[in-house]
Amino acid sequence: MTVTELALATPYMKAEIRDGVGWMTFNNPERRNAMKMEMNEAIVEILGAFQADDAVRVVVMQGAGDRAFVSGADISEFEANRSTPEGRERFDAVAAAAGRAFKSLEKPLIAKIRGFCMGGGLATALQADIRITADDGQFAIPAARLGLGYGVAGLQVLVSLVGPAMANEIMLSARRFTAAEAGAMGLVNRVVPVAALDGAVDELAGQIAANAPLTVKAAKAAIAEVVKDPERRDLARVEHMIEACFQSEDYIEGRRAFMEKRQPEFKGR
């Protein structure tokens, strides 16, 4: 197995590529992977590198250690970074850039969750296409206990997943929800025992990585357009991507492999 590590400016993030999977790790375990501003800056670099590398078929993000995915923003930085209008503007710009990097990623993104997934950590997990949590996962948005405001953009995905009633309970109570509760409300795709988490994520990532990249890309794009307001949908972009699938070498390979009763070897072209 070939492993390629990305050199990053911060020790609080790690990134590597192995077997067609890009792994992005939030590496601040002493603070339960609380998100520092420099970690948001690194997200832009990491996802940009994964997007540009044809060897990466799918991306998995995870927290270091066994206590947390991301426990939220690093509140110890608030005084330095968010106590003035200028500081908040800078912080918001960095966070917005990370958000754009997530939205620009055309490859499937899986969130692998253990332990705390709170506040900004839950917002980060909601950027994923698929969320798999161990049964020790804990979820919350404690903004109401911190005096923070959440805008429409920050709540759009949450409401689309769990509906307005559960979104209200999450936001207004600021309480913690168990992994079982998160699964029942549709906040996560799957809840598995702690011991089964690695295998479940590895299996799913491998399945996606083995599929035709152009088809996977087109499917992700189409689903993203479906959940938009009708007047904001870019249907022409999706149609172009679908046509690219039918014109691809992989379409020929897929049909040939089916007829020959073998596994296809897709190239992404």
Segments predicted by a language model, with ranges:
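Charged catalytic carboxylate motif
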Residues: 38, 42, 94, 101, ...
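Conserved CoA-thioester-binding segment of acyl-CoA-metabolizing enzymes
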Residues: 1-62, 100
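Amphipathic alpha-helical segments at domain termini/boundaries
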Residues: 1-27, 175-209, 217-226, 254, ...
